[in-house]
Amino acid sequence: MYKIYDDCISKEIADKIEKTLLDRKYLWNYGNHTVHEEVPDPQMFHLLHMFNPIIGMRNGKSIVGEGKTTKSDFFYLVEDLLSEIKKNTDIELDNKVLYRAKSTILFPNAVSQKKESEIHIDFGDNQSTRINILYYANESDGDTILYESDVKTIMKRISPKKGRFVLFSGDIPHCASSPTESYKRVVMNINFGSS
């Protein structure tokens, strides 16, 4: 299950998110690996990227399940975005638990011809009960690709557009593509589970 939403986030909130994520005060962390630290296949390709854990992560790992939650000073961006989603769509989030929210910035890849990251799901257990929201914070290229369960057949390519977001089931394999025409691709990734 996936659904793409356009024109549901007000210009005011979309501009606020973009401006904040691209502000010099918003600190990014270097990410050498897209998904996992160990690379099971030497042919596997990880996009070098920058990220900022907004809630629920420590050292790149979710800590919500440990009974602890960390929130960055930028958690208000998640609250603003979710408020807009609740107000302007029929998406029901009240019975969901927020597991993780992070922002990611990708740059053009000059190292390899490969433009897609590792195909992955965001968490390893109970995927069918989880949902993901991927919000595009700026105008750019660098599609998100959703795959069928065989992890070979493309289900949908989603092009970034400022203010667009895609809601999809946690069991859908997916990957990001680095931009080739734009200087940066900025997203917020929000993961929910059942309460």
What are these regions (language model features)?
Residues 1-94:
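Non-heme Fe(II)/2-oxoglutarate
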Residues 64-195:
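Catalytic core of non-heme Fe(II) oxygenases with the double-stranded beta-helix
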